[in-house]
C-alpha cells in the first residue's frame, strides 16, 4: 500500500511538472512576465526532441524519461515514449491516435515559437523564420511517416537536412540571445 501511495505522489508530481511545461510552451508568450521563460522552454523542448533525439529517438523528452524511470522504481510500468500519449490515451482515455497527438504537438510548439520570437524580439534576420517553418514542416512530414521514438538515420538526406535546419534554428536563436538582441 505504501508503494501505491508513493507511486501516486510521484506520478502527480511529474504530471504537474509536465503540465506546467506544456502550458509555458504553448501560452507563455501571452504574458510579459513569462516571455523569456517561454522562449527558454521552447528551445529546451526542441533541443530535446532533435539533439537528444539523435541518441534516444526523435521526440525524446528527458522529463518523460525521468517520469517513467521514477514510476518504474515502484514496479514495472508500460510508460509510452510520449508524455502526451500517457496523459491523453492512458489517463484520460481519449480515443485518438498517437500520431495525431505527436503532429498536433509539433504544430503547437513551432507555432508558439514563432509567436514567442515575434513577442521577444524583432529580428532583421529572416533566416530564423525560414528555419523555423522549414523545421516545422519537415518534422511534420517525418513524424507523419515514421512516428516518434525512432533513432534517426543521418544517411537519410531528408532527415539529415531537417536535423541541420533544426540545429541551425536553435543556434541562431541562441546567438541572438547572446547578442542581447531581445
What residue spans do the PLM features occupy?
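Hydrophobic transmembrane alpha-helical segments in integral membrane proteins
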Residues: 2-22
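Non-cytosolic membrane-interface motifs at loop->transmembrane helix junctions
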Residues: 10-12, 63-65, 149-161
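Individual transmembrane alpha-helix segments
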Residues: 11, 86-117
